[in-house]
């Protein structure tokens, strides 16, 4: 859990990690399978840094989210092509989790999704409504999962907001 864990002051907090000694030393898939009825106000997704697992964690998190809850996925705004590769090849590494946000922006109109332009991208999701991305109209491409297309359209794809916009929208 690292530095931030002790600073989180809530009645219920769980950490899930198969490698780190935390509340639940298991994979997120195992956790979601075994703890079906547990609900949370806030779920932080920062796991394997690969698209498929991040997407699965977000979908599973939705089933464990209280009605007014929020999910945050970390590392969704990679700074370079090498940083977004699914296998770590450099010091800076996000993996391709940005694709999970893209998929949700393309397919799930019942989520409100924004990405705060901070700390390699923090994407916030909560139940609500969003206008789905239209590949041809919004980014003029069918190949949205290509990094170069993402690079040129990241603000639109991630629905990027600034830290001050985040504070105004979520903290006021």
Task: Identify the role of each PLM range.
Residues 42-44, 72:
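Structural motif
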Residues 53-172:
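C-terminal substrate-binding/active-site "lid" region of AdoMet-derived donor-dependent transferases
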Residues 46-49:
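Switch II (G3) loop of P-loop NTPases
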Residues 1-35, 40-42, 77-80, 85:
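SAM cofactor-binding core of SAM-dependent methyltransferases
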């Amino acid at each position: 859990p690292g530095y931030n864990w002790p600073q989180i002051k809530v009645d219920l907090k769980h950490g899930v990690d198969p490698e780190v000694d935390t509340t639940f030393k298991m994979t997120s898939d195992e956790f979601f399978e075994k703890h079906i009825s547990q609900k949370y106000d806030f779920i932080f997704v920062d796991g394997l840094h690969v698209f498929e697992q991040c997407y699965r964690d977000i979908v599973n998190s939705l089933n464990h989210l209280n009605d007014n809850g929020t999910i945050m996925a970390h590392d969704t705004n990679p700074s370079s092509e090498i940083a977004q590769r699914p296998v770590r090849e450099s010091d800076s590494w996000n993996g391709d989790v940005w694709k999970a946000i893209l998929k949700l922006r393309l397919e799930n109109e019942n989520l409100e999704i924004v990405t705060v332009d901070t700390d390699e991208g923090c994407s916030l999701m909560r139940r609500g409504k969003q206008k789905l991305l239209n590949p041809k109209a919004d980014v003029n491409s069918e190949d949205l999962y290509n990094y170069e297309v993402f690079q040129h359209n990241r603000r639109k794809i991630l629905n990027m907001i600034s830290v001050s916009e985040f504070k105004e929208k979520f903290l006021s």
